[in-house]
Amino acid sequence: MADEIAKAQVARPGGDTIFGKIIRKEIPAKIIFEDDRCLAFHDISPQAPTHFLVIPKKHISQISVAEDDNESLLGHLMIVGKKCAADLGLNKGYRMVVNEGSDGGQSVYHVHLHVLGGRQMHWPPG
């Protein structure tokens, strides 16, 4: 976890990201779901027995810069996350998280929804 915090503290918005490369299929990912608006794939550094990301294909660097016309797309990410969680057997519950900015732990500046499950989640989370 400390490694992710360190990455978040030095990450900055702008430019291409690893998620752009995954969307363009330039680098591999364990894809769970894909449609014309988003992509869901397993996290390469899972923080729970099941941990996947749902990302929009349209680049939006942060929730804080999302526009009103992104509302449907951002809602779609949550619906896809719910469906993928069900497909992966997370029937006892799961957590959805969006990290915003360096203090929020955002290490990749392309909006992404974390879905974590397969164990009891604790509160507070961080």
From Swiss-Prot:
Motif Histidine triad motif: positions: 110-114
Residues forming coiled coils: none
Gene3D superfamilies registered for this protein in UniProt: HIT-like
HIT domain mapped to chain residues: 18-126
Positions bearing Phosphoserine: 45, 72
InterPro entries: Histidine_triad_CS, Histidine_triad_HIT, HIT-like, HIT-like_sf
Primary location group: cytoplasm
GO biological process entries: intrinsic apoptotic signaling pathway by p53 class mediator; protein desumoylation; proteolysis; purine ribonucleotide catabolic process; regulation of DNA-templated transcription
Catalytic residues as annotated in Swiss-Prot or TrEMBL: 112
Subcellular localization: Cytoplasm; Nucleus
Reactions performed catalytically: adenosine 5'-phosphoramidate + H2O = AMP + NH4(+)
Keywords, comma-separated and alphabetical: Acetylation, Apoptosis, Cytoplasm, Hydrolase, Nucleotide-binding, Nucleus, Phosphoprotein, Protease, Thiol protease, Transcription, Transcription regulation, Ubl conjugation pathway
UniProt EC number: 3.9.1.-, 3.4.22.-
Keyword Protease: yes
GO cellular component, one term: histone deacetylase complex
Biological function: Exhibits adenosine 5'-monophosphoramidase activity, hydrolyzing purine nucleotide phosphoramidates with a single phosphate group such as adenosine 5'monophosphoramidate (AMP-NH2) to yield AMP and NH2. Hydrolyzes adenosine 5'monophosphomorpholidate (AMP-morpholidate) and guanosine 5'monophosphomorpholidate (GMP-morpholidate). Hydrolyzes lysyl-AMP (AMP-N-epsilon-(N-alpha-acetyl lysine methyl ester)) generated by lysine tRNA ligase, as well as Met-AMP, His-AMP and Asp-AMP, lysyl-GMP (GMP-N-epsilon-(N-alpha-acetyl lysine methyl ester)) and AMP-N-alanine methyl ester.
Known partners and oligomeric status: Homodimer. Interacts with CDK7. Interacts with RUVBL1 and RUVBL2 and is associated with the LEF1/TCF1-CTNNB1 complex and with a KAT5 histone acetyltransferase complex. Identified in a complex with MITF and CTNNB1. Interacts with CDC34 and RBX1, and is part of a SCF (SKP2-CUL1-F-box protein) E3 ubiquitin-protein ligase complex. Interacts with SUMO1, SUMO2 and RGS17. Interacts with the Ten-1 ICD form of TENM1. Interacts with CALM1; interaction increases in the presence of calcium ions.
Protein name: Adenosine 5'-monophosphoramidase HINT1
